[in-house]
Amino acid sequence: TPALPASSSPPNWVEANHPLGWLINRVLAVEPLRQLLFWQARRLIIRTAEGRGIDWRQRRDLLQAAAEPLLAASTNPSAAVPAYYRARFHAYDQGNLCWAAACEAEQATDSMALRVWPEEPELAPDVAQLRLRRAIFSAIEPSLSGPVRRVLDLGCSVGVGTFALRDWLLERQAAAAFAASLGSPAVAGVEPSPAAPPAPLLVEGLDLSAEMLAVARVREAEAL
């Protein structure tokens, strides 16, 4: 997928002052219509996921059962949660602050990645996710002038993008170390010194939803 130029801007119809944007906002302001549209969109995402082998409901229940004991450790009582985090989000009336949103985020993200390539019905969810993330990272790469040592992913949700970014940065770090070792000048009769190990990479995720963080902890433990 080609990267968008830095100057790209969203289509003008998303603006509220555009006729289509105004119409969309008006339609969504009618509660029965909003509920119907969100319900249909949710069904579409779930149908895409389950049609490609993602067990949406079983995975949701598994994540919630494993994450509930981690909720207290993922909660910061002093954190000030902004209003938009409590606002209705997609099909979730409680926004990001609910188990349903947190325990379905992984499946929904995979489903959305699959929908980027509708012409490839055999595409596996993990392959679609990897392809999508690598397209994003390829757009980031030119702006990185040197090694990355520490990353904070703001609004990390359940860590799908966070873990993908960590893996990509580790690969980038290893490739740079290998290239540096090949470029070391050889001296006759002297064994080349081994390349210095790369500095540790720290990638952290930050989110104001304790439910999201609890699920992220479960997913991190699964990857170990």
Spans of model-derived segments:
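Mature, folded catalytic cores of secreted/periplasmic enzymes
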Residues: 78-81, 90, 101, 128, ...
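Conserved alpha-helix/loop element of class I SAM-dependent methyltransferases that forms part
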Residues: 108-149, 164, 168, 172
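Class I SAM-dependent methyltransferase SAM/SAH-binding core
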Residues: 150-183, 192-224
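N-terminal auxiliary segments of SAM/dcSAM-dependent transferases
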Residues: 10-106
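N-terminal chloroplast transit peptides
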Residues: 1-3
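Glycine-rich, flexible loop segments associated with nucleotide phosphate handling
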Residues: 80-89, 125-130, 194-203
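Short, well-structured alpha-helical patches and their helix-loop capping segments
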Residues: 84, 124, 128, 132, ...
